[in-house]
Amino acid sequence: VETWTVETDDDGSRLEVHSFRPAQPTGAEGNKPAGGSADNTGNSTSAKADPATVTAPGVVVIHGTLVTDALYRPFARNLSLLLSRPVHCYNRRGRAGSAPQPDDYSVQTEVGDLAAVMKATGSEDVVAHSFGGFVALQAARDIPLRRLVTYDAAVSLSGNLHHRWRPELEQAVTDGQLNHAWAHLVQGLATAGPLSYLPLGALRMLSIMSARTTVGAEMRELLPTAVKEMRAVLDADAELADFTQLATPTLMLSGGWSPGYFADTGRQLASAVPAIDFAVVPGQLHEGPIRPGKRLAIRIARFLNGTDGTITPQGRKRRRA
Protein backbone atom coordinates (compact mmCIF):
# COMPACT_ATOMS: atom_id res chain seq x y z
CA VAL A 1 0.00 0.00 0.00
CA GLU A 2 1.19 3.52 -0.82
CA THR A 3 0.36 6.41 1.52
CA TRP A 4 0.24 9.97 0.23
CA THR A 5 -1.85 13.13 0.44
CA VAL A 6 -4.18 15.08 -1.84
CA GLU A 7 -4.78 18.81 -1.50
CA THR A 8 -8.40 19.88 -1.77
CA ASP A 9 -9.57 22.58 -4.15
CA ASP A 10 -11.51 24.67 -1.64
CA ASP A 11 -9.21 25.62 1.22
CA GLY A 12 -5.98 23.73 0.61
CA SER A 13 -6.79 21.08 3.21
CA ARG A 14 -5.20 17.67 2.85
CA LEU A 15 -6.69 14.19 2.63
CA GLU A 16 -4.75 11.02 3.37
CA VAL A 17 -4.90 8.49 0.52
CA HIS A 18 -3.92 4.81 0.48
CA SER A 19 -3.38 3.28 -2.95
CA PHE A 20 -3.22 -0.30 -4.18
CA ARG A 21 -1.79 -0.84 -7.64
CA PRO A 22 -1.34 -3.87 -9.88
CA ALA A 23 2.19 -5.26 -9.96
CA GLN A 24 4.44 -3.23 -12.27
CA PRO A 25 6.81 -4.97 -14.70
CA THR A 26 10.33 -5.10 -13.33
CA GLY A 27 13.22 -3.53 -15.17
CA ALA A 28 11.26 -0.53 -16.42
CA GLU A 29 12.44 2.27 -14.17
CA GLY A 30 10.00 4.74 -15.61
CA ASN A 31 7.04 2.62 -14.51
CA LYS A 32 7.99 2.48 -10.85
CA PRO A 33 6.23 4.86 -8.46
CA ALA A 34 8.49 7.77 -7.59
CA GLY A 35 9.29 8.84 -4.06
CA GLY A 36 7.12 11.55 -2.53
CA SER A 37 3.41 12.17 -2.33
CA ALA A 38 1.23 14.26 -4.60
CA ASP A 39 -1.18 17.14 -4.41
CA ASN A 40 -4.18 17.43 -6.73
CA THR A 41 -2.01 18.74 -9.55
CA GLY A 42 0.15 15.61 -9.50
CA ASN A 43 3.16 17.47 -8.08
CA SER A 44 5.36 15.56 -5.66
CA THR A 45 5.21 16.67 -2.02
CA SER A 46 6.26 14.66 1.01
CA ALA A 47 5.03 11.08 1.52
CA LYS A 48 5.59 7.75 -0.20
CA ALA A 49 4.06 7.60 -3.67
CA ASP A 50 3.48 9.59 -6.85
CA PRO A 51 0.23 8.65 -8.63
CA ALA A 52 1.31 10.33 -11.86
CA THR A 53 3.33 7.27 -12.88
CA VAL A 54 0.18 5.14 -13.28
CA THR A 55 -1.78 5.50 -16.52
CA ALA A 56 -4.64 3.00 -16.02
CA PRO A 57 -7.81 4.72 -14.75
CA GLY A 58 -8.28 4.10 -11.07
CA VAL A 59 -11.17 3.38 -8.72
CA VAL A 60 -11.89 5.42 -5.60
CA VAL A 61 -13.43 3.78 -2.51
CA ILE A 62 -15.42 6.02 -0.13
CA HIS A 63 -15.85 4.73 3.41
CA GLY A 64 -18.83 5.09 5.75
CA THR A 65 -19.49 6.75 9.10
CA LEU A 66 -17.67 5.98 12.38
CA VAL A 67 -14.77 4.31 10.57
CA THR A 68 -11.57 5.16 8.71
CA ASP A 69 -10.36 3.82 5.39
CA ALA A 70 -8.16 1.28 7.21
CA LEU A 71 -11.04 -1.21 7.40
CA TYR A 72 -11.52 -1.02 3.62
CA ARG A 73 -7.96 -1.73 2.59
CA PRO A 74 -8.34 -5.54 2.26
CA PHE A 75 -11.38 -4.94 0.04
CA ALA A 76 -9.48 -2.34 -2.01
CA ARG A 77 -6.53 -4.71 -2.42
CA ASN A 78 -8.83 -7.51 -3.64
CA LEU A 79 -10.59 -5.16 -6.04
CA SER A 80 -7.28 -3.95 -7.47
CA LEU A 81 -6.15 -7.53 -8.08
CA LEU A 82 -9.46 -8.45 -9.73
CA LEU A 83 -9.50 -5.39 -11.99
CA SER A 84 -5.74 -5.08 -12.59
CA ARG A 85 -6.26 -1.38 -11.95
CA PRO A 86 -5.27 1.01 -9.17
CA VAL A 87 -7.75 1.31 -6.31
CA HIS A 88 -7.53 4.23 -3.88
CA CYS A 89 -9.03 4.62 -0.40
CA TYR A 90 -8.94 7.95 1.38
CA ASN A 91 -9.72 9.12 4.87
CA ARG A 92 -12.60 11.55 4.77
CA ARG A 93 -12.42 14.69 6.89
CA GLY A 94 -12.18 14.31 10.63
CA ARG A 95 -9.95 11.22 10.46
CA ALA A 96 -6.27 10.93 11.34
CA GLY A 97 -4.12 12.06 8.42
CA SER A 98 -6.88 14.20 6.90
CA ALA A 99 -8.14 17.69 7.64
CA PRO A 100 -10.89 18.25 10.23
CA GLN A 101 -14.49 18.86 9.22
CA PRO A 102 -14.95 22.62 8.65
CA ASP A 103 -17.57 24.67 10.47
CA ASP A 104 -19.63 24.92 7.26
CA TYR A 105 -19.35 21.18 6.57
CA SER A 106 -21.98 19.78 4.16
CA VAL A 107 -22.32 17.21 1.43
CA GLN A 108 -20.67 19.71 -0.93
CA THR A 109 -17.54 19.48 1.22
CA GLU A 110 -17.48 15.74 0.58
CA VAL A 111 -18.27 16.08 -3.13
CA GLY A 112 -15.42 18.55 -3.56
CA ASP A 113 -13.06 16.22 -1.70
CA LEU A 114 -14.06 13.27 -3.89
CA ALA A 115 -13.48 15.34 -7.03
CA ALA A 116 -10.00 16.29 -5.78
CA VAL A 117 -9.10 12.66 -5.04
CA MET A 118 -10.38 11.49 -8.43
CA LYS A 119 -8.41 14.20 -10.22
CA ALA A 120 -5.19 13.44 -8.35
CA THR A 121 -5.47 9.68 -8.82
CA GLY A 122 -6.70 9.71 -12.41
CA SER A 123 -9.75 7.71 -11.34
CA GLU A 124 -13.01 7.32 -13.26
CA ASP A 125 -14.99 4.81 -11.16
CA VAL A 126 -16.27 5.00 -7.59
CA VAL A 127 -17.26 2.32 -5.07
CA ALA A 128 -18.95 3.69 -1.96
CA HIS A 129 -20.40 2.33 1.28
CA SER A 130 -23.20 3.71 3.47
CA PHE A 131 -22.56 7.45 4.00
CA GLY A 132 -19.99 7.15 1.22
CA GLY A 133 -22.78 5.96 -1.09
CA PHE A 134 -24.75 9.10 -0.27
CA VAL A 135 -21.71 11.22 -1.16
CA ALA A 136 -21.12 9.33 -4.41
CA LEU A 137 -24.73 9.62 -5.61
CA GLN A 138 -24.73 13.33 -4.88
CA ALA A 139 -21.41 13.68 -6.72
CA ALA A 140 -22.69 11.76 -9.75
CA ARG A 141 -25.24 14.54 -10.28
CA ASP A 142 -22.45 17.10 -10.72
CA ILE A 143 -19.16 15.49 -11.75
CA PRO A 144 -18.46 12.92 -14.49
CA LEU A 145 -18.09 9.31 -13.31
CA ARG A 146 -17.65 6.34 -15.63
CA ARG A 147 -19.30 3.77 -13.34
CA LEU A 148 -20.55 3.81 -9.77
CA VAL A 149 -21.31 1.08 -7.24
CA THR A 150 -22.93 1.80 -3.89
CA TYR A 151 -23.55 -0.59 -1.00
CA ASP A 152 -26.28 0.38 1.48
CA ALA A 153 -26.22 4.00 0.33
CA ALA A 154 -27.52 6.29 3.10
CA VAL A 155 -29.68 8.54 0.93
CA SER A 156 -32.66 10.39 2.41
CA LEU A 157 -35.61 10.36 -0.01
CA SER A 158 -38.72 12.37 0.81
CA GLY A 159 -37.72 12.50 4.46
CA ASN A 160 -37.53 8.73 4.91
CA LEU A 161 -34.48 8.93 7.20
CA HIS A 162 -35.58 11.83 9.39
CA HIS A 163 -37.18 9.57 11.99
CA ARG A 164 -33.85 7.78 12.40
CA TRP A 165 -32.20 10.94 13.67
CA ARG A 166 -32.03 10.98 17.46
CA PRO A 167 -31.58 14.48 18.97
CA GLU A 168 -30.30 12.67 22.08
CA LEU A 169 -27.28 11.55 20.03
CA GLU A 170 -26.07 15.08 19.40
CA GLN A 171 -26.75 16.14 22.98
CA ALA A 172 -24.89 13.14 24.36
CA VAL A 173 -21.86 13.92 22.17
CA THR A 174 -21.95 17.54 23.34
CA ASP A 175 -22.07 16.37 26.96
CA GLY A 176 -19.23 13.89 26.43
CA GLN A 177 -21.50 10.91 27.15
CA LEU A 178 -20.09 8.82 24.32
CA ASN A 179 -21.50 5.47 25.44
CA HIS A 180 -24.98 7.00 25.54
CA ALA A 181 -24.40 8.60 22.13
CA TRP A 182 -23.25 5.32 20.58
CA ALA A 183 -26.34 3.55 21.92
CA HIS A 184 -28.67 6.11 20.34
CA LEU A 185 -26.82 5.96 17.03
CA VAL A 186 -27.01 2.16 16.87
CA GLN A 187 -30.70 2.11 17.78
CA GLY A 188 -31.55 4.88 15.34
CA LEU A 189 -29.74 3.53 12.29
CA ALA A 190 -30.23 -0.18 13.10
CA THR A 191 -26.99 -1.04 11.29
CA ALA A 192 -25.63 -3.42 13.94
CA GLY A 193 -27.95 -6.30 13.08
CA PRO A 194 -29.95 -7.85 15.96
CA LEU A 195 -27.86 -5.87 18.47
CA SER A 196 -29.56 -2.70 17.26
CA TYR A 197 -32.79 -3.74 18.96
CA LEU A 198 -31.35 -4.18 22.44
CA PRO A 199 -32.43 -1.72 25.17
CA LEU A 200 -30.36 1.45 25.52
CA GLY A 201 -28.84 0.24 28.78
CA ALA A 202 -27.56 -2.95 27.16
CA LEU A 203 -26.16 -0.98 24.24
CA ARG A 204 -24.34 1.35 26.61
CA MET A 205 -22.71 -1.67 28.25
CA LEU A 206 -21.70 -2.97 24.81
CA SER A 207 -20.15 0.41 24.05
CA ILE A 208 -18.11 0.27 27.25
CA MET A 209 -16.88 -3.22 26.38
CA SER A 210 -16.12 -2.43 22.74
CA ALA A 211 -14.13 0.65 23.76
CA ARG A 212 -11.42 -1.76 24.93
CA THR A 213 -10.83 -2.78 21.30
CA THR A 214 -9.02 -0.68 18.71
CA VAL A 215 -12.04 -0.44 16.41
CA GLY A 216 -14.43 0.31 19.26
CA ALA A 217 -12.23 3.05 20.68
CA GLU A 218 -11.89 4.57 17.21
CA MET A 219 -15.67 4.57 16.73
CA ARG A 220 -16.14 6.49 19.97
CA GLU A 221 -13.57 9.08 18.88
CA LEU A 222 -15.41 9.54 15.58
CA LEU A 223 -18.87 10.13 17.10
CA PRO A 224 -18.60 13.94 16.68
CA THR A 225 -17.96 13.46 12.95
CA ALA A 226 -21.01 11.18 12.73
CA VAL A 227 -23.25 13.95 14.04
CA LYS A 228 -22.17 16.31 11.25
CA GLU A 229 -22.41 13.56 8.63
CA MET A 230 -25.94 12.59 9.64
CA ARG A 231 -26.93 16.25 9.55
CA ALA A 232 -25.50 16.48 6.03
CA VAL A 233 -27.64 13.53 4.91
CA LEU A 234 -30.83 15.05 6.32
CA ASP A 235 -30.03 18.52 4.97
CA ALA A 236 -29.61 17.02 1.48
CA ASP A 237 -32.98 15.24 1.59
CA ALA A 238 -34.04 14.71 -2.02
CA GLU A 239 -36.91 13.58 -4.22
CA LEU A 240 -36.71 10.92 -6.91
CA ALA A 241 -36.98 13.64 -9.54
CA ASP A 242 -33.64 15.05 -8.36
CA PHE A 243 -31.87 11.95 -9.68
CA THR A 244 -33.70 11.32 -12.96
CA GLN A 245 -31.04 13.10 -15.03
CA LEU A 246 -28.23 10.99 -13.56
CA ALA A 247 -26.41 9.38 -16.50
CA THR A 248 -23.64 7.40 -14.77
CA PRO A 249 -24.24 3.63 -15.01
CA THR A 250 -24.85 2.81 -11.36
CA LEU A 251 -25.30 -0.42 -9.44
CA MET A 252 -26.89 -0.01 -6.02
CA LEU A 253 -26.39 -3.03 -3.77
CA SER A 254 -27.84 -3.83 -0.38
CA GLY A 255 -27.03 -6.67 1.98
CA GLY A 256 -29.65 -9.35 2.49
CA TRP A 257 -29.27 -8.85 6.24
CA SER A 258 -28.93 -5.06 6.11
CA PRO A 259 -31.69 -2.79 7.46
CA GLY A 260 -34.56 -2.81 4.98
CA TYR A 261 -34.60 0.92 4.38
CA PHE A 262 -31.38 0.69 2.33
CA ALA A 263 -33.02 -1.74 -0.09
CA ASP A 264 -36.19 0.36 -0.21
CA THR A 265 -34.15 3.38 -1.31
CA GLY A 266 -32.27 1.35 -3.92
CA ARG A 267 -35.48 -0.05 -5.39
CA GLN A 268 -37.11 3.37 -5.57
CA LEU A 269 -34.15 4.93 -7.34
CA ALA A 270 -33.75 2.01 -9.75
CA SER A 271 -37.43 2.20 -10.69
CA ALA A 272 -37.20 5.92 -11.44
CA VAL A 273 -33.73 6.35 -12.95
CA PRO A 274 -32.77 4.43 -16.14
CA ALA A 275 -29.06 4.56 -15.31
CA ILE A 276 -29.51 2.83 -11.94
CA ASP A 277 -29.89 -0.88 -11.29
CA PHE A 278 -30.45 -2.46 -7.88
CA ALA A 279 -29.71 -5.87 -6.39
CA VAL A 280 -29.71 -7.54 -2.98
CA VAL A 281 -26.57 -9.47 -2.02
CA PRO A 282 -27.80 -12.51 -0.06
CA GLY A 283 -26.20 -13.27 3.28
CA GLN A 284 -24.41 -9.92 3.59
CA LEU A 285 -24.66 -7.58 6.57
CA HIS A 286 -24.41 -3.79 6.43
CA GLU A 287 -20.64 -4.15 6.94
CA GLY A 288 -20.31 -6.20 3.74
CA PRO A 289 -17.36 -4.33 2.16
CA ILE A 290 -15.26 -4.56 5.33
CA ARG A 291 -15.91 -8.21 6.12
CA PRO A 292 -13.56 -11.02 4.98
CA GLY A 293 -14.04 -12.69 1.63
CA LYS A 294 -13.94 -11.81 -2.06
CA ARG A 295 -17.51 -12.50 -3.17
CA LEU A 296 -18.67 -8.90 -2.92
CA ALA A 297 -15.49 -7.60 -4.56
CA ILE A 298 -16.00 -10.03 -7.45
CA ARG A 299 -19.59 -8.83 -7.93
CA ILE A 300 -18.45 -5.22 -7.98
CA ALA A 301 -15.47 -5.88 -10.28
CA ARG A 302 -17.76 -7.51 -12.85
CA PHE A 303 -19.96 -4.44 -12.92
CA LEU A 304 -17.03 -2.06 -13.21
CA ASN A 305 -15.70 -4.15 -16.10
CA GLY A 306 -19.13 -4.16 -17.75
CA THR A 307 -19.32 -7.96 -17.72
CA ASP A 308 -22.27 -8.57 -15.38
CA GLY A 309 -25.06 -7.81 -17.85
CA THR A 310 -26.94 -5.30 -15.68
CA ILE A 311 -26.60 -1.97 -17.49
CA THR A 312 -25.47 -1.14 -20.99
CA PRO A 313 -22.66 1.44 -21.47
CA GLN A 314 -25.32 3.98 -22.49
CA GLY A 315 -26.82 3.69 -19.02
CA ARG A 316 -30.04 1.98 -20.14
CA LYS A 317 -31.12 -1.23 -18.48
CA ARG A 318 -31.23 -4.40 -20.52
CA ARG A 319 -34.43 -6.32 -20.62
CA ARG A 320 -34.23 -9.54 -18.68
CA ALA A 321 -36.01 -12.70 -19.62
PLM features per residue range, with description:
Residues 246, 252-254:
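Short beta-strand/loop motif that positions the catalytic acidic residue
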Residues 141-175:
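Flexible "cap/lid" loop of the alpha/beta hydrolase fold
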Residues 128, 132, 136:
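Gly/Ala-rich beta-loop-alpha elbow adjacent to hydrolase catalytic centers
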Residues 259-265:
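Conserved alpha/beta-hydrolase "acid-adjacent" motif
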Residues 9, 13-25, 53-99:
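Conserved HGGG/HGGXW glycine-rich cap/lid loop of the alpha/beta-hydrolase fold
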Residues 88-127, 298:
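Active-site loop/oxyanion-hole signature of alpha/beta-hydrolase fold enzymes
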Residues 281-295:
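Catalytic histidine-centered segment of alpha/beta-hydrolase-like enzymes
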Residues 2, 210-238:
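Hydrophobic, aromatic-rich cap/lid helix
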